[in-house]
Amino acid sequence: MKVIVLKAVAAAAVLLMAASSHAAPTLVRDARVFDGERVHERRSVLFDGAVIVDADFRGAPPAGARIVDGAGRTLLPGLIDAHVHAFRYLELPLLFGVTTQVDMFNSVQIMQELKTAMTAGKNGGRADMFSAGTLATAKGGHGTQFGMPIPTLATPGEAQAFVDARIAEGSHFIKIAWEEGHGAHRMNSLDAATVTALIEAAHRRGKLAVVHISTLAHARAALEMGADGLVHLFIGKDIAAADADALARLAKAKRAFVIPTWVVLESMAGVKTDGVLSDPALAGLLDREQRQSLRASYGQSPMPEQLVAPKAVIAAMHRAGVPVLAGTDAGNAGTQYGISMHQELAALVAAGMRPGEALAAATSAPARAFGLGKRGRVASGYKADLVLVEGNPLVDIASTRRIVEVWKDGESTEPLRVRQRERVARENAEPGMAPVTLPADGRISLFTKEKLASPFGMGWSPTHDGMMGGASSATLELLPLDAGAPAALAVRARVVKANFPYPWAGLAFGPGAQPMQPANLSAVKTIAFRVRGDGQRYALSMMSRGVTIPATVHFIAGPEWKEVSVPLSRFPGIDPALLTMIGFNAGPEPGDYRFEIADVRLLDK
């Protein structure tokens, strides 16, 4: 058996002893208790401060204890999301019962700040986080596209120094990105020798090494190299049963775990299941911006057939006894912190896991796999991170959504939930921004020698990847007017290979009064424009508030003028009432580009 010594467990022990002042003891009485592994039909649980004092309490309640009625309810350990990117909304997971997040890539500053707060026992109002910090990737590889400079590596000889630097920063484990991209969107990636060297370097320091993969071949190879876990599965229209079973047997033999991240795979496949958003008990805890991220999607059109392979692999892993952990990849399009866990649990059950097994995948299993100390269980001496729900999620997994109360470090999060509900209710009651009045002809490209104007907003300007440290560039030139025709603009773009996967350059329209300020364009149903150019492919992109990656529709700029008309419904997750940017861009392939654009219109039909 492969043994990895995880040194960060000590932090949890310090936290459990740290409370210098806390509320009165709490007794949850006569509840059904799922302890992270088994169900107990009727138990009382006493916790005091940050610690569960007695997971099977009997007798008279302690003097002054708060009594919570558990009849007809189920008490669960605080849920653990085994795959997130927790760069914002650190309190949001608590509202949905997620008390711990395993972070797969984050800024060192956020990681260190939360680690310090957790060690001091002062992280009660936020979900705890155990992070990989900076992931291991190649120059221009997966993880370099977010605009913050990160160290990268290119050869096996750099692996040990890279791992040692991450450990010195406070990384709990090492995450490795082995991602070559797909189709036309290829990207730099670590080679197999460097991935192997990183895994071995992590193990030499007693750290787990987990690998981001997106193909069956890489999944097999990573397991053969000794990866402790796969932090994604992969989409695909089909997979032979023999291949799924062989992968599961390999994972079992290597004692590895798997985090399917079904929710983000749905996003990649363009499939939206609105169960959590249509549940008022859950959606009422998200503001408009937070809901928008959940509605977003990486896939531009539904391709449910792409989910056949991951569902089959989850089932095979489960049959083989491989630890399957519940993780959402929250922070990405189609996800949201906390709430997406309930969708992930439902997906695991749909793939063949029993509800109790899915609950273990979100509690005791990730705590054990990542060495998170005394959490993930309802047991004496364990951390008092608890969730009380109505009904029986051991029978109906959707009962996890019927949250009665959440405790973090023994403190009720109910005040936080009440404040959030009140804030969301106020936002929903407010009229919001007044809709922009569109011109009668819809035209927003008012190009003249004096100004690249528009009837509202900031107008038009060149855009490029310089904000991310790229070297791409764009120049704009007003073309001589054809008689009776709207003015046209020539866009010359040079896209330069960068240290991130998607360099770009082109033309942007800002609908708000300030950069990236939203405008209410809810009346818009279609964007139309005329274009001609060098025959290359370009991207029409849109962003709205709360969306971190643009939604994109591609078009070809051929040698003759042509009309392009795109319904806004083709931009998944974009809220026209909060639109922040419209772009016409070249890239990501390096090279010189030229297109001409005219008569850009926003139409209400």
Can you annotate each of these PLM segments?
Residues 429-605:
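Beta-rich carbohydrate-recognition modules and glycan-binding surfaces
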Residues 33-44, 57, 336, 354-359, ...:
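Acidic, glycine-enriched loop/beta-strand segments at the rims
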